[in-house]
């Protein structure tokens, strides 16, 4: 008897209010870290009806022109007309950034050159063989749809689209393997002139059928395109946006646990971000090496402490090696101190704006060092000893 179930993940476009906030926070981080690699940055952004507020804590000698940075991000996303609910030229930009507490900094920057964790916390990484990039299929497909929504809007293939949008994909699994798409939900902001019928047909033909892998498509997929019937008011005019509210979209679509820490606006001394990247790096290399088909990795840290307080590996009964053996391998092959992660993944670079929409994982860009599988041979060698 087949074990059959549905699993669902969602994604949002770069014009979604929460993603706007993430992108502004990461643009501020990139501006500062490009000029000061020793900077400590924790940047939070709020976008709402007609205004943007940037807040958080910094420790840097760099002056960051917050207004210019925020307006450029909003312009690039496509909020270039007040009719869209937000305009980069007329929106107010407020700066409420303060200085980082010296109580925090004393535990992070150490005289011996090591770096203590910027906070306590637990972070997860995940990898599986459902896609070429070793990501779960539902979140992979959901990101493809939202990315295509933005591209078709920007290249004028579908000129009636506006920046805000979301996707959701339900995948049918049989015996723990994806076999088909069951349901697709797409909600996209649009101009008031376009009819619901034309919008639905265009989105299905120009996006779904041109983007998604044909082996998962079939005639009985259930489509819900703008199921409320109209989505003209969107972006920050429709909903306030905040940094760090799309942590499941940013990661694995719910396929593995999440420690709760957001990524955007945080420099890599914050293990919420850097250790989550390291956990993905570990999980992906374990799967790429062939020692397992699926891996969930948990790392945990204490503020000011160099070494992780725990390392956990779960291969979901897909490995002949025990968790204890795999954890021993991980500790031998990977550098999991904050400094070790930063150096091995080369994280002191202005790369974070690239991460802030369409997922931090599963996109094999040159800048995404945590997506490399260059440790797979070392893992194989460890188990041959």
UniProtKB/Swiss-Prot annotation:
Question: Which positions are annotated as binding K(+)?
Answer: 44
Q: Which Gene3D superfamilies match?
A: 3.30.300.10
Q: Which residues does Mg(2+) bind?
A: 18
Cite the Pfam families for this sequence: S-AdoMet_synt_C, S-AdoMet_synt_M, S-AdoMet_synt_N
Q: Which family does it belong to?
A: Belongs to the AdoMet synthase family.
The note on cofactor binding and number reads:
Binds 2 divalent ions per subunit. Binds 1 potassium ion per subunit.
The biological pathway it contributes to is: Amino-acid biosynthesis; S-adenosyl-L-methionine biosynthesis; S-adenosyl-L-methionine from L-methionine: step 1/1
Record's subunit section? Homotetramer; dimer of dimers.
Give the protein's cofactors. Answer: Mg(2+); K(+)
Quickly give the catalysed reaction.
L-methionine + ATP + H2O = S-adenosyl-L-methionine + phosphate + diphosphate
> Which residues make up the binding site for ATP?
16, 164-166, 230-231, 239, 245-246, 262, 266
* GO aspect biological process, one term: S-adenosylmethionine biosynthetic process
Q: Where is this region: Flexible loop?
A: 100-110
Q: What is this protein called?
A: S-adenosylmethionine synthase
- Superkingdom, taxonomy of origin: Bacteria
Enzyme class of the recorded protein, top EC level: transferase
Q: Which GO terms describe its molecular function?
A: ATP binding; magnesium ion binding; methionine adenosyltransferase activity
Purpose of the protein: Catalyzes the formation of S-adenosylmethionine (AdoMet) from methionine and ATP. The overall synthetic reaction is composed of two sequential steps, AdoMet formation and the subsequent tripolyphosphate hydrolysis which occurs prior to release of AdoMet from the enzyme.
Q: Which UniProt keywords apply?
A: ATP-binding, Cytoplasm, Magnesium, Metal-binding, Nucleotide-binding, One-carbon metabolism, Potassium, Transferase
InterPro entries reported for this sequence: ADOMET_SYNTHASE_CS, S-AdoMet_synt_C, S-AdoMet_synt_central, S-AdoMet_synt_N, S-AdoMet_synthetase, S-AdoMet_synthetase_sfam
Which is one Gene Ontology cellular component term of this protein?
cytoplasm
Q: Which EC number(s) does the record attach to this protein? A: 2.5.1.6
CDD domains per UniProt: S-AdoMet_synt
